[in-house]
């Protein structure tokens, strides 16, 4: 259910874009994201930091898109979010000395430090690559291509990378 809720605003964005335009879709994305955040809080009495940060960026970039009637703002949101994710991963590892992925998962999964480091860097590079791909597709290809990439391409890439990470973790997990 939680994964469906996380994906719901993206589905709303895609549907509204195809029915109307990028501006209605941006407004719908803001509203759907806010509703999911409220529902999550009411249902679980907790909202993850990533969800809150993502919502704030959706609200900011979506509002700028609507206010200035300029789709470039909503297109930048994806790259900004992915860049923040990459920065958080790299800062946790190189400044604070413990990979963020390890902080999130080490209660359930036990891996050697080298594996946590590799996994953390791999995800940071993945997010940077997705952010760079977003810039290219958003600003050099038609808007409809970008919308499909945002909804299906990035989602598919993330699922594949998650699966590959799971395989990598399974190879080194000390609990199996």
Curated annotation (Swiss-Prot):
InterPro entries: YciB (IPR006008)
Membrane spanning stretches: 22-42, 50-70, 81-101, 121-141, 149-169
Membrane topology: Multi-pass membrane protein
One Pfam family it belongs to: IspA
Entry's Gene Ontology cellular component terms: plasma membrane
Entry keyword set: Cell inner membrane, Cell membrane, Membrane, Transmembrane, Transmembrane helix
Subcellular location: Cell inner membrane
Keyword Methyltransferase part of the UniProt annotation: no
Domain of life: Bacteria
PANTHER family: INNER MEMBRANE-SPANNING PROTEIN YCIB, INTRACELLULAR SEPTATION PROTEIN A-RELATED
Family statement: Belongs to the YciB family.
Function: Plays a role in cell envelope biogenesis, maintenance of cell envelope integrity and membrane homeostasis.
Protein name as it appears in the record: Inner membrane-spanning protein YciB
Protein species of origin: Sodalis glossinidius (strain morsitans)
């Amino acid at each position: 259910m939680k994964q469906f809720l996380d994906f719901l605003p993206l589905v709303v964005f895609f549907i509204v874009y195809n029915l109307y335009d990028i501006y209605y879709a941006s407004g719908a994305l803001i509203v759907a994201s806010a509703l999911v955040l409220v529902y999550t809080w009411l249902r679980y009495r907790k909202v993850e930091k990533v969800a809150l940060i993502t919502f704030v960026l959706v609200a900011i970039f979506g509002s700028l898109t609507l206010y200035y009637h300029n789709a470039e703002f909503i297109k930048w949101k994806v790259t900004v979010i992915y860049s923040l994710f990459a920065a958080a991963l790299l800062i946790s590892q190189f400044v604070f000395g413990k990979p963020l992925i390890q902080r999130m998962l080490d209660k359930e999964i036990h891996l050697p430090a080298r594996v946590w480091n590799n996994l953390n860097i791999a995800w940071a590079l993945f997010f940077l690559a997705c952010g760079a791909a977003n810039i290219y597709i958003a600003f050099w290809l038609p808007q409809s291509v970008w919308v499909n990439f945002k909804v299906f391409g990035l989602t598919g890439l993330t699922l594949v990378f998650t699966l590959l990470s799971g395989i990598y973790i399974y190879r080194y997990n000390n609990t199996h």
